[in-house]
A protein has these predicted regions:
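HotDog/MaoC-like acyl-thioester-processing domains
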Residues: 1, 64-97
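Hot-dog-fold acyl-thioester-processing enzymes
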Residues: 1-55
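Short alpha-helix capping/helix-loop boundary micro-motifs
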Residues: 56-64
Length: 97
């Protein structure tokens, strides 16, 4: 499965407030998107296509993700990765039902 998503400032602020994130890297002119936010979005996408909940997830973070970037979420029932528009690997990992 391959899906694309651009994360806007409103989505980021909503997430940061909901988890009470105060990390200065996640705010400002060119904020870094928290890795857990990317994993949250990825899991929501997974749940849209597969009926079984996840019981295990392992992720390796490779590069920072920046606001207003268009991300490519690629996943199947066993593995996932997220890249930016330049195909820079942001994170990759595996999961199990």
């Amino acid at each position: 499965m391959k899906l694309y998503k651009k994360i806007n400032k409103a989505d980021l602020i909503d997430y940061l407030q909901s988890v009470k994130d105060t990390n200065s890297l996640h705010y400002g002119k060119n904020p870094i998107i928290p890795g857990n936010f990317l994993l949250f979005i990825l899991e929501e996408m997974y749940q849209e296509f597969y009926s079984m909940p996840l019981s295990y997830l392992k992720a390796n973070f490779c590069s920072p993700a920046y606001l207003n970037e268009r991300f490519c979420f690629i996943f199947n029932q066993n593995a996932f990765q997220i890249t930016d528009r330049n195909q820079t690997l942001i994170l990759k990992g595996e999961w199990k039902q």
